[in-house]
């Protein structure tokens, strides 16, 4: 079994009922929904400096991040996965099965990603709900360290159970020791980083890795019922694509639009261009200039358009790049603020494209996830872990699984008791 840590016993977290832990975490997060809360003000400035994102983008991200962390959403996720909060406190009866206790694993190590704001926060709060000791390697903006201070103010036991290593190097002895002692390792990053972390972890540690993935948008012809609705879908698609400069697994980089709707593919492409221009004003690009790869992709699209193949729209100052009908044999452009748009006759073209380019999908946004069962089935078969609503791609629900993995289940082990 993985090595145990004594910090959990010292923190007193295991003696707290899960419902009190959940309530305290929800109360702490509620403070962070106030844009004028001093720790949030300081964190916002640090995130802007680290990521280069503009302040409106960071504020949008923090509103949605902490707005989701409520006692209701935490409870819904936990009860949906393990049956009840009480299962985290001790043995509970189960119909037709032995009594069981979902005991939190003592040591958890969590590694945040370089880009997505607060991506490790849900893992941290659910590990605490499971009464685990938590070591987290955070980015230099120290967002999680600041939130841990707020948790301490709510319940000192929470602060005693979490230790944040902000900006620490992966090879630092203190971090390597925490990684070796962890019974669970949760990590966000690229393939090489995940392999390195896995090799450093204990051989029998539970490893939950979230690699680099991307998202897409699919617009069914039935959704293009009139110009007003098409305009709304275009606006949502633009937000999904441009919000975080195309960073993170939930940024859409590819849009598939079915032909044959009341609003034509060409008209929707024009509406999408207008929407990108508007979103680029509301959420301006970060401080970095367009990368060379973006400029090269733009120039290639311009050359093809001059020959009568496809189209291209380039926002002022490189605020967005919209490429219409790029060659299907080319891999999709997973580039900052870059969106490729394809006209299709049916969902089979989407699945063929994804399969031929081995696109690692995290989510696909559609107009109405409940309205198109054939499309949703194809999305599920493509490897995507989530079917989102257009315009809400960047706002995942805390009560839902992430990356196809449960929220609380990675941090518990079941202990059964015979009758």
Which residues does each predicted region cover?
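N-terminal Rossmann-like NAD(P)+-binding subdomain of aldehyde/semialdehyde dehydrogenases
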Residues: 1-105, 364
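Conserved small-residue-rich beta-alpha loop and adjacent elements
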Residues: 86-154
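Donor nucleotide-activated moiety binding/catalytic core segment of transferases
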Residues: 93-109, 168-179, 320-336
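Structural motif
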Residues: 112-113, 187-191, 220-222, 257-260, ...
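Short, charged/polar "capping" segments at the starts of alpha-helices
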Residues: 145, 194, 369-376
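Conserved NAD(P)+-binding/catalytic subdomain of aldehyde/semialdehyde dehydrogenases
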Residues: 155-259, 397-419
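NAD(P)-dependent aldehyde/semialdehyde dehydrogenase
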Residues: 244-252, 256-362, 373-417
């Amino acid at each position: 079994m993985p090595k145990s840590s004594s910090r959990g016993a010292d923190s007193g977290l295991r003696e707290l009922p899960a419902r009190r832990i959940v309530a305290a975490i929800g109360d702490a997060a509620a403070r962070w929904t106030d844009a004028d809360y001093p720790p949030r003000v300081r964190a916002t400035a640090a995130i802007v400096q680290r990521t280069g994102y503009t302040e409106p983008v960071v504020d949008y991200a923090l509103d949605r991040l902490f707005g989701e962390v409520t006692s209701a959403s935490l409870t819904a996720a936990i009860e949906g996965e393990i049956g009840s909060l009480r299962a985290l406190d001790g043995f509970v009866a189960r119909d037709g099965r032995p009594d069981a206790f979902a005991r939190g694993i003592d040591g958890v190590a969590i590694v945040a990603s370089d880009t997505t704001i607060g991506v490790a926060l849900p893992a941290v709060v659910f590990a605490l709900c499971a009464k685990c000791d938590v070591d987290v390697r955070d980015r230099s903006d120290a967002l999680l360290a600041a939130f841990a201070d707020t948790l301490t103010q709510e319940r000192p036991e929470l602060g005693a159970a979490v230790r944040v290593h902000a900006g620490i190097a992966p090879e630092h002895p203190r971090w390597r020791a925490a990684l070796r002692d962890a019974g669970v390792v949760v990590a966000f990053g690229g393939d090489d980083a995940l392999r390195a972390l896995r090799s450093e972890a204990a051989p029998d540690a539970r490893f939950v890795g979230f690699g680099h993935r991307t998202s897409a948008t699919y617009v069914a012809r039935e959704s293009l019922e009139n110009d007003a609705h098409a305009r709304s879908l275009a606006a949502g698609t633009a937000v999904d694509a441009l919000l975080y400069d195309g960073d993170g697994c939930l940024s859409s980089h590819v849009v598939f639009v079915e032909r044959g709707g009341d609003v034509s593919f060409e008209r929707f492409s024009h509406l999408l261009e207008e929407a990108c221009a508007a979103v680029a004003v509301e959420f301006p690009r970060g401080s970095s200039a367009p990368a060379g790869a973006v400029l090269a992709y733009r120039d290639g699209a311009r050359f093809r358009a001059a020959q009568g193949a496809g189209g291209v729209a380039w926002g002022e100052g490189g605020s967005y790049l919209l490429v219409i009908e790029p060659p299907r044999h080319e891999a999709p452009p997973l580039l900052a603020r870059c969106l490729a748009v394809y006209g299709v006759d049916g969902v089979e073209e989407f699945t063929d494209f994804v399969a031929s380019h081995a696109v690692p999908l995290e989510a696909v946004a559609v107009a109405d996830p409940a309205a198109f069962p054939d499309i949703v089935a194809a999305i599920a078969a493509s490897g995507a872990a989530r079917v989102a609503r257009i315009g809400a791609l960047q706002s995942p629900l805390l009560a839902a699984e992430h990356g196809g993995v449960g929220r609380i289940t990675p941090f518990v082990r079941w202990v059964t008791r015979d009758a």
